[in-house]
Amino acid sequence: GLEETYCSMKIK
């Protein structure tokens, strides 16, 4: 969900 997208943003 949103958390998954947030993690992707943090990695990038």
Swiss-Prot record:
Superkingdom: Eukaryota
Keyword Nuclease part of the UniProt annotation: no
GO molecular function: nutrient reservoir activity
Keywords for the protein's UniProt record, in alphabetical order: Disulfide bond, Seed storage protein, Storage protein
Keyword flag Disulfide bond: yes
Family: Belongs to the 11S seed storage protein (globulins) family.
Oligomeric and partner information: Hexamer; each subunit is composed of an acidic and a basic chain derived from a single precursor and linked by a disulfide bond.
Function recorded in the entry: Seed storage protein.
Protein's recorded name: Globulin 1
Organism: Elaeis guineensis var. tenera (Oil palm)
